[in-house]
Amino acid sequence: MTTEQTDIMDKIQSFRPHLKPSTIKQYYHQLKKLQMRLKENDFEFLMNADDTIQKINKLTSDKNPSELLHFTSKRNIYNPVILYLLALDKDKNVIKKYEVERDKLNNQYQDEQLTGKISSKQGKNFVHIDDIIKMITTMKNELKPKLKTNMNARDIALLKAYTLFEILVRFPTRNDLAGLQLITPSKFKKITEEEKKNNNYIVRAKPNSYFVWNEFKTDKKYQSISENIPKDLEKIINTYIKINNYKSGDIIFDFSRNGLSQILLNASGKYLGGIQLSTTMIRKSYLSSKYSD
């Protein structure tokens, strides 16, 4: 690990102490990738927000260089950029420019989700919700005999993917599960509004645990939404928490939004014969099923 990487990761850790090193490392690598793609020597280029935003808008896809970068990929660039600048206490006016761009892309994403419309590009990865549920059942049956044994890393990875899919077919959010923090009701009452605004939570309470979603809106439209977790899903999540020995305050899905996407894409690709499901496609399958009648 270079001195630069250590210094940046330490500053982000101090700014967001609840983030685990693996998540911060992912953010750093996203920043480094942007720096390399724009052929810059350091991160000072980020201080020229107008020029950087213009260059990001011209970036092309890694998989298909003839296509511009998808808007969700651009959004995922802005999140670590904003976090980095906040952690280093940089000019708030510069940060605001990046936040405006990110929020535009968030709004674009939300508008697409409300329509449930499937683009030609997404069509090849569209599956009916029943097929997703069958996939989840296959995962469940594969996991069942392993839950009472010493699970290896591959088993734990499958449990993580299974738990994510079980949540997403009931709560078809965006990638807001990334960085989800486990917390008790008493501790949740003590956290500041600023902390609530920048994180999403699973609150373990009686008689019902519940999710608190805070990152799905722009600052101007900010509000908090709580959703009770059904008992059958709560049991699945509790199993995941117990096996991983998570405690209050821990991040139970310790990966970036891009990391979450990769988990879903890889797992679904294996169980659906190469069809790869993102949170977007799960949501579209959910909406298609819900409003098909």
Question: Model-found features: residue ranges?
Answer:
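Active-site/catalytic core of tyrosine-dependent DNA strand-transfer enzymes
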Residues: 222-282, 286, 291
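Basic, Lys/Arg- and aromatic-enriched nucleic-acid-binding interface segment
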Residues: 134-175
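Alpha-helix N-cap/helix-start motif at helix boundaries, enriched for small hydrophobics
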Residues: 24, 164, 176-181
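Conserved tyrosine-mediated DNA breakage-rejoining catalytic core shared by Y-recombinases
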Residues: 180-231
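Flexible interdomain linker/hinge and immediately adjacent N-terminus
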Residues: 94-146
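N-terminal DNA-binding module of tyrosine recombinases/phage integrases
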Residues: 1-14
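A short, basic/aromatic helix-end/turn motif that makes direct DNA contacts
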Residues: 180-186, 280-281, 291-293
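Non-catalytic DNA-binding core/recognition domains of DNA-processing enzymes
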Residues: 13-105, 264, 280-284
